[in-house]
Amino acid sequence: MTRDQTATFGRHALRVAGSGLLVAGVVALGLLGWQWRANVTVDRVAVTGAQHAPPDTLRRLARVGRGTAMRAVAPMLVADRVARHPWVKEATAETQWMQGALTISVTERTPAALAVDAQGRPAYYLDRSGHAMPLPDSAGYDVPLVRGLEAEAPWTQPDTAQTPSSLRRVLRALPEAGVADLVAEIEMQPDDAIQLTTTPIGPHDALPVHLGSGNVSRKLRTLRAFARQVLASSPDEPIERIDLRFDGQVVTRTRPLDG
């Protein structure tokens, strides 16, 4: 073997040896990384975004305690468990391996109405979609009252206690029609029809409003326009009832002025 062949062979051998060492190093690091991941456990469960849902309650729903193997945590399953709390609208979960933490982020429902029982006592809140939330320990919300619903919390019997669709339509339409501050009460009738009670407007006290069925958003916009154009003024005869059951029409009942 010539001197050049010997040098070439030596360089080739060095490259092979170097490649082998590199592969061995990568494999060793991989094994160390796998071993590290296998030993990482959850040190803390952090909850963010919760205002009314107690964080400890959400942690119990998550069913991931300190010492749980991080590789055994399924974030989507954890989020699904947490989202079962009545106040939680959306939930996400994220594992943070380096910190040994599980972070749960929640978005809570926004109250749109307050259901009261037959004695007028607060029972539970409702959001715009008709989901019920238990009364929080913190301060209440300035939202319309809902009468005529079951006083028992719907989340205790989800298969039998459901918010009527007519009420859900009204709750969704109130802010869209710009009348959320105009409606003081929503009363469910036996046939699931809706009667509203306004806040005092101009010289008028609170007025009952028969809403009827049909296009709820359009009816509420009609009520808003009527309140601005008529109720805010002083009519010849005070209005004591408003009927919106007929599309495109506002029917009122008046009472004669005394004297």
From Swiss-Prot:
Q: How does it sit in the membrane?
A: Single-pass type II membrane protein
The residues exposed to the Periplasmic compartment are: 37-259
Q: List the keywords (alphabetical).
A: Cell cycle, Cell division, Cell inner membrane, Cell membrane, Membrane, Transmembrane, Transmembrane helix
Q: What does the organism's lineage look like at the top?
A: Bacteria, Pseudomonadati, Rhodothermota, Rhodothermia, Rhodothermales
* InterPro entries hit by this protein: Cell_div_FtsQ/DivIB_C (IPR005548), FtsQ (IPR026579), FtsQ_C_sf (IPR045335), POTRA (IPR034746), POTRA_FtsQ_type (IPR013685)
Pfam families linked: FtsQ_DivIB_C, POTRA_1
Mind naming one GO cellular-component term on file for this protein? Answer: cell division site
Q: Establish whether keyword Cell membrane is in the entry.
A: yes
Q: Where is the POTRA domain?
A: 40-109
Q: Which organism is it from?
A: Salinibacter ruber (strain DSM 13855 / M31)
By sequence similarity, the record places it as follows: Belongs to the FtsQ/DivIB family. FtsQ subfamily.
Which residue ranges traverse the bilayer? 16-36
Q: What is the purpose of this protein?
A: Essential cell division protein.
- Return the PROSITE patterns for the record: POTRA
The biological processes this protein is annotated with in GO are:
cell septum assembly; FtsZ-dependent cytokinesis
Question: Any idea what this protein is called?
Answer: Cell division protein FtsQ
Q: Where in the cell is it found?
A: Cell inner membrane
HAMAP family membership = FtsQ_subfam
Residue intervals on the Cytoplasmic side: 1-15
